Amino acid sequence: MGLHDEARLDHKMMLLIKQLNLYLNHFPKHEKYGLCQQIRNAAYDVYGMIVEAQKRYHKKTTLSSLDIRHEQLRMFVRVAFELGYFGFRNQAVSSDDPQGLAERRFHTLGVMIDEIGRMLNGWIKAETARQSKVQ
């Protein structure tokens, strides 16, 4: 993965974190230190692991861990959607079409998470190809 692609991945991850934090601020108060915190930590971990993978010479194990943490982030967001937390506005269920609001928010995050996942998989494939050339 080239330097330009890595910068794009950083940028995409930062956009995801901003959007996640915007939506997570509306979760119910009883989830502030539960699922909400798990999602935030997973997003921050993914961002930190991206930086770590960019700096390491041997990237394969870091990229593998990064891929796992990315899947955990995807799973946590899915759990929040299934529990109906994306339908909340200001810690209360939205009065105007909470299901529609939840679906729009989940779709927005899903698209962003999927795009980052495709970029990570491309990076993993490029790194695997690079390592097989060296051997």
Predicted regions and their residues:
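Amphipathic alpha-helical assembly/interaction segments
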Residues: 1-135
